[in-house]
Every structure is written in C-alpha cells, then in structure tokens.
C-alpha cells in the first residue's frame, strides 16, 4: 500500500483554499455578458476557446494533491449544476468560493464549523423559498427566446432558434443539437421519438467521439421479455444480417450468452447491431413498446399475442430512417409506420388523458403523446472553423438546457439581481446560537458575489457602487452589464431560469459546507525518482567483466 501524507486543521483548509481559488479564479472571468474567453490547450489539434464555466472547470488538474482536492470539490459544484440545470455553472463556482472564503475567516476566528454549516443550510433553505416567491412562469415564444439568448452568452440568433424549435415540437418535444455541414445555423424538424434507455454495452458505439451508436435505415426488433438464450434470437439475426441493414433490438433485457454474442459479432463487423432495454415498467412498458411498434410499422413480439421470438420474420420488424443511441437515450427518427395507425394511436392516448383521474398517469400519458406526435427538432449549428463550431455548439446545448429549466420552474430577474432580492428571505432564518447566526450572515455576503463579479468583468465600473444602487432599487431594477445602464432587467430581456439560480446556490453551499467541516486531508506520498540511472549489469567494459 502506498504511504500517505496527512495534514490537519488550518494547514489542510489553507491548502484546500488555494486549490479552490485557482479553479474559481479561472472560471469566474467568464461570468456575465462582459465575461472573457478562456483558451484551453489540447494534446491534439487546435486549442479550445470557451466562455463556458463547466468546460473550464473540467480541464483543471493541479500538481499539488491537496490543492487539487479543493479544486475538484468546486469542479463538482459546476458539474452538478450543469447536469441538473444546464447553466449557472460559473455562478455556482463564484458562490462556492465566496461561502468557503467567508466561512474560513470565521473558522480561523474560533467559530464551530458544524454550527456554521447548520446556519448556512438554514439560510439557503429560506433563500430558495424567496426565489420561488419572486419567480414567474413563462409561456410565450418571446420569453423563451429571452432565456435562450441570455444562456447562449447574449446570442439572439440562438435564443430565437430555440424558441422556434419549442414552438414546433412543443415544450415536451425532443430537441437535438448537431453540427451543420456548412456555415449556416438552421432549424430542421423531423418526425421522431426519444425514450430514456441507452445502449446495454459501450461496444455497440459506432461514433467514439460522441459515444453514440448511429444506425442508418435500421430494422427494429421489439420484444417484451428477457433474451438470454442465443438460440431463440439466432433465426431473426441471420435474416436481418442477410438484408444488410443495421438492427436495433429493444427488449426487457439482454444478458449472458445473447449479449456476449451480439457484442462479439458487432466487433468483428459481421453484424451492425445495437441493443437497448425497453422503456418504462409494467403496463406502461407494454404501452410504450406498442407506441414504438406503431411508429415504426413493426410488431411487438409477445407470447401474450401468440408470437414467438424464434419464429419471427422480417415482417415483424419495424423500420426507421435513422436511430441514435447514447448511454442514456435512444432517438428514433423517421419511423416508417402507417400515418393512419399513428393518428389512431394519438387519438387513443388523448382519450385516456381525458378520462385519467391521476396526475401521475396524466403526466406519463402526455409524455407518450409528445413522443408520438411532437417529433424531433434538430438544430444544425454552422460556423467558419472547427474551434468556433465546438464553442457555439456547447453554448447552444447550455441554452437549450436552461430554457427547459425555465419552462419547468419559471424565471427570475437576471444579472445577479435575483440573489440580491432573495436576501430578504434571510430575515426568516432562525439561528440557535451565534455561530449559526454567522452562517446565515456568510450566505448574506455570498449572495452579493455574482453581481460583484459580473460588474468586475466589465472592467469599467466600481462593483461596490453598483451593488449599493441595486440594493436600494426594487423588483426588476438592476445593472445591465452589456449596456452598462441601470434599467428594468426583465424588460431588457435579462432573465435567469429559477432552477438554474436555485441549483447554483444549493450545490455551492453543499460543497462549501463540506470543505468548511474538513479537519484533515489525506494524500498519497509521491515517490521521488532518482536522477542517477541504474548501472548496467555485466561490469565495466574492457575489464573482463570484473568490478
């Protein structure tokens, strides 16, 4: 076992802080409309230029092990916020740094870390409640475009495209982002369906860069039971292999010998195949398999209906124009089902929605309806160079996530102002002792930090002056860093999804609290390599092998 180095107390916290600051300082320069770009070196190809906080955070690895632990903890804040809300990664990083910095001062002055944590937790709870109170729902195309524009670093073209896509396929419809062949960015709507099941083995991947299995003009086998025996699957596999078309297998599960055989044949190139689990559970799974079968013109091979897998022929298989499978989702585009059958199925689901008495059932039926009728909107992103293409595509993906978050939980005023307005929620936070009260005050101070940083990135205005003026204002009044004017930010289109702001604060407080209550850091001791090369065996030349 490798020997360990252990550092305690203030030494550990100070080193962790160095790591936190290194990562946060690199990330926070990207915040706001006046945020700068960060250039990231790549081992192969051109460097990447980005203004996306989580992309910067993911690239940072520090030489010192303890400092690196601090950096990785804050990286987790950015990563988790991106996963949950799709945006707000830089805000989350700025908040985490501020909470840890303020907390550390108080721990050094003798405050109990665990009480500080309790105070921080209570404060965050009240601020989140206040954010929900000041949140407003969005529905119109214009409001959706505003959110998309802000999240795409003030690119109105992207905001308009996302609003248009949501208008075409509905708020629950599927929107994917792809690289265009030319320089123009455009929206294309393709009929299709997506369900939340990914490939059963990464060996099915055909595009290693995106870790996706892409099947062009595939056949689709739909089975409602587990497949573990290769014998029952073999006849239909041989028939599909003879057709020369790729095959997607959707079943309850594929395991053991059957999965191993599929993987081996896929790697040898004898079969173009991918396997996924069936979506849903119980009766809902049966209904969703039937939806897929109707959309693709196939048949669910089910023993309940008298169909056996070993007797299946090509007529049982569904067909589609293209299928994309990643680790989490399967998207079926251009299903070859009969339009009249698809329409009848849609009407059947609409009838079930009207009769449903359960909110949960209604929600799930509406999801199925969206998958069958909404189709897939494809945003084809064009750019002059590959570097610009990657940067723009990342911004579009962020903006899309943020816009969905806005539709789910509503919007609040942007530009760091919502957190300033939510400070009044701290009046309701109850502290049992002085240290908990200090924890609440730490959050009060940290909530100002995103606005300070947005102003600092403009490079022309004094943050303290702006902060005071915004605090004295009310409602949507704030500082527009793009125009450097004080105005009604919502009317100016400066808004943030409530979910993004909430997730940023919750994740930042969670990680900063863990760092504050850390008393020891354990790392591997690096073995120092000797500069002297080992002496070759066999003695010295010309000495007859003698030493």
From Swiss-Prot:
Annotated ATP binding sites: 30-33, 51, 87-91, 415, 496
Locations listed in the record: Cytoplasm
Domain of life: Bacteria
Keywords: ATP-binding, Chaperone, Cytoplasm, Isomerase, Nucleotide-binding
SUPFAM superfamilies: GroEL apical domain-like (SSF52029), GroEL equatorial domain-like (SSF48592), GroEL-intermediate domain like (SSF54849)
Record GO biological process: protein refolding
InterPro entries: Chaperonin_Cpn60_CS, Cpn60/GroEL, Cpn60/GroEL/TCP-1, GroEL-like_apical_dom_sf, GROEL-like_equatorial_sf, TCP-1-like_intermed_sf
Name used for this protein in its record: Chaperonin GroEL
Lineage: Bacteria, Pseudomonadati, Chlorobiota, Chlorobiia, Chlorobiales
A Pfam family that the UniProt record links to this protein: Cpn60_TCP1
UniProt function note: Together with its co-chaperonin GroES, plays an essential role in assisting protein folding. The GroEL-GroES system forms a nano-cage that allows encapsulation of the non-native substrate proteins and provides a physical environment optimized to promote and accelerate protein folding.
Database matches in PANTHER family: 60 KDA HEAT SHOCK PROTEIN, MITOCHONDRIAL
Gene Ontology cellular-component terms listed: cytoplasm
Predominant localisation class: cytoplasm
UniProt similarity note: Belongs to the chaperonin (HSP60) family.
Catalyzed reactions per annotation: ATP + H2O + a folded polypeptide = ADP + phosphate + an unfolded polypeptide
Quaternary context: Forms a cylinder of 14 subunits composed of two heptameric rings stacked back-to-back. Interacts with the co-chaperonin GroES.
Molecular function per GO: ATP binding; ATP-dependent protein folding chaperone; isomerase activity; unfolded protein binding
EC number: 5.6.1.7
Keyword Zinc on entry: no
Keyword Ribonucleoprotein part of the UniProt annotation: no
The gene coding this protein: groEL
CDD domains per record: GroEL
């Amino acid at each position: 076992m490798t020997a360990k180095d252990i550092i305690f107390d203030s030494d550990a916290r100070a080193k962790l802080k160095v790591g936190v600051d290194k990562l946060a300082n690199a990330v926070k320069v990207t915040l706001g409309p006046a945020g700068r770009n960060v250039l990231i070196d790549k081992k192969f190809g051109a460097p990447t230029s980005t203004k996306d906080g989580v992309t910067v955070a993911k690239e940072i690895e520090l030489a010192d092990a303890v400092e690196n632990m601090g950096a990785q903890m804050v990286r987790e804040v950015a990563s988790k916020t991106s996963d949950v809300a799709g945006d707000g990664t830089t805000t989350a990083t700025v908040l985490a740094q501020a909470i840890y910095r303020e907390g550390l001062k108080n721990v050094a002055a003798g405050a109990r870390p665990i009480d500080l944590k309790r105070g921080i937790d209570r404060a965050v709870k009240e601020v989140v409640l206040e954010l929900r109170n000041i949140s407003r729902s969005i529905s119109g195309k214009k409001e959706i475009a505003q959110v998309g524009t802000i999240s795409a670093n003030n690119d109105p073209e992207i905001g308009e495209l996302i609003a248009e896509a949501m208008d075409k396929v509905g708020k629950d419809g599927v929107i994917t982002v792809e690289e265009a062949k030319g320089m123009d960015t455009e929206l294309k709507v393709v009929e299709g369906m997506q369900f939340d099941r990914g490939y059963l083995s990464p060996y099915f991947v055909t595009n290693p860069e995106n870790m996706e299995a892409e099947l062009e003009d595939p056949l689709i086998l739909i089975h409602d039971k587990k497949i573990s025996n290769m014998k029952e699957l073999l006849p239909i596999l041989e028939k599909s292999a003879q057709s020369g078309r790729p095959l997607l297998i959707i079943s309850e599960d594929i395991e053991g010998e059957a999965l191993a055989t599929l993987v081996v044949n896929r790697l040898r190139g004898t079969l173009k195949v991918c396997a996924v689990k069936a979506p849903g559970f119980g009766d809902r799974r049966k209904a969703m398999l039937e939806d897929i079968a109707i959309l693709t013109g196939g048949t669910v091979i089910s023993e309940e209906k008298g169909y056996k897998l070993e007797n299946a022929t090509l007529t049982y298989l569904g067909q589609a124009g293209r299928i994309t499978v990643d680790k989490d989702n399967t998207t079926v585009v251009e299903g070859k089902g009969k339009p009249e059958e698809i329409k009848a199925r849609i009407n059947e689901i609409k009838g079930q929605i009207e009769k449903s008495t359960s909110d949960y059932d209604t929600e799930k039926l509406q999801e199925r309806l969206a998958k069958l009728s909404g189709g897939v909107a494809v945003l084809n992103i064009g750019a002059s160079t590959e570097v610009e293409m990657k940067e723009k595509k990342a911004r579009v993906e962020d903006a899309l996530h943020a816009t969905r978050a806005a539709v789910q939980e509503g919007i609040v005023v942007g530009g760091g102002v919502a957190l300033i307005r939510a400070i009044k929620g701290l009046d309701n936070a109850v502290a049992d002792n002085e240290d908990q009260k200090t924890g609440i005050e730490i959050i009060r101070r940290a909530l100002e930090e995103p606005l300070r940083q947005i102003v600092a990135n403009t490079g022309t205005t004094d943050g303290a002056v702006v902060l005071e003026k915004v605090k004295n204002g009310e409602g949507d009044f704030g500082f527009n860093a793009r125009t450097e004017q004080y105005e009604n930010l919502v009317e100016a289109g400066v808004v943030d999804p409530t979910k993004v702001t909430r997730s940023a604060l919750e994740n930042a407080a969670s990680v900063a609290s863990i760092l504050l209550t850390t008393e020891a850091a354990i790392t591997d001791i690096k073995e120092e390599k000797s500069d002297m090369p080992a002496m070759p065996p066999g003695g010295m030349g010309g000495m007859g092998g003698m030493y």
